[in-house]
A protein has these predicted regions:
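CoA-thioester-processing core
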Residues: 14-21, 29, 35-89, 102, ...
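C-terminal long alpha-helix characteristic of the crotonase
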Residues: 49-54, 96, 105-159, 165, ...
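Glycine-rich phosphate-binding loop at the start of an alpha helix
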Residues: 6-13, 36, 66, 93, ...
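Short, basic/aromatic-enriched C-terminal tail that caps enzymatic domains
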Residues: 176-191
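An acidic, glycine-rich surface segment that forms the CoA-thioester-binding/catalytic face
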Residues: 1-31, 158
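Helix-capping/helix-break motifs at membrane-protein junctions
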Residues: 1, 80, 110-111
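A general structural signal for well-ordered alpha-helical segments in protein cores
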Residues: 5, 12, 72, 81-84, ...
Length: 191
């Protein structure tokens, strides 16, 4: 019935919202098909890599449905209104190169090097200040969401000012600036 369907969609949105707003980076590595809920899951991740053989799509309209776990919103945020409408209304699948061109994925690589490339990027991110990484995630997410319940009525700029202040008083900021002045690699502790 309708109430059960709405509850299912709400639960899915809640799970994907937690992924999207996790303070630690979550990166999707897609090797094969990411359709329907799978595509919605990848879009909830902070960014996406895929192999050359990846395919993406929101084919729910073929079942008389629409994406229910935030896909109508995230796809539009990532690829723009017109292309989002087209992909959802036609159920057209796109390949890795088109996904890259549209901004749905950040990188395309071979299937053999997909995991290695993903880990390389994550290792770079892990070498940065973890509190700052979490604040970047918060600020970027506020920039693409207009829901005042999510943003607590703050603009993205307001959130950025607050997050900058939060980072400014951390031990990581002291370590980062000291390391810069001493011309050495920073050793961030997440404090």
């Amino acid at each position: 019935n309708k109430d059960e369907a709405m509850a299912l969609a709400k639960r899915g949105q809640d799970v994907f919202f937690k992924i999207e707003n996790c303070k630690k980076p979550i990166v999707a590595a897609v090797n094969g098909f990411a359709l329907g809920g799978g595509c919605e899951l990848t879009m909830a991740c902070h960014f996406r890599l895929c192999s050359e053989n990846a395919k993406f799509g929101q084919p729910e309209v073929n079942l008389g449905l629409i994406p229910g776990y935030g896909g109508t919103q995230r796809l539009t945020q990532l690829v723009g209104k017109g292309k989002s409408m087209e992909l959802q209304m036609t159920a057209h699948l796109i390949d890795a190169n088109e996904a890259l061109q549209l901004g749905l994925v950040n990188h395309v690589t071979t299937a053999e090097s997909l995991l290695e490339r993903t880990i390389d990027i994550l290792n770079v991110i892990m070498s940065k200040a973890p509190i700052a990484i979490g604040k970047i995630i918060e600020c970027v997410n506020v920039a693409v969401v207009s829901d005042s319940a999510y943003t607590n009525g703050k603009s993205g700029y307001d959130k950025e000012v607050e997050a900058f202040g939060d980072c400014f008083v951390t031990e990581d900021m002291k370590e980062g600036t000291t390391a810069f002045l001493e011309k050495r690699k920073a050793n961030f502790q997440g404090k």
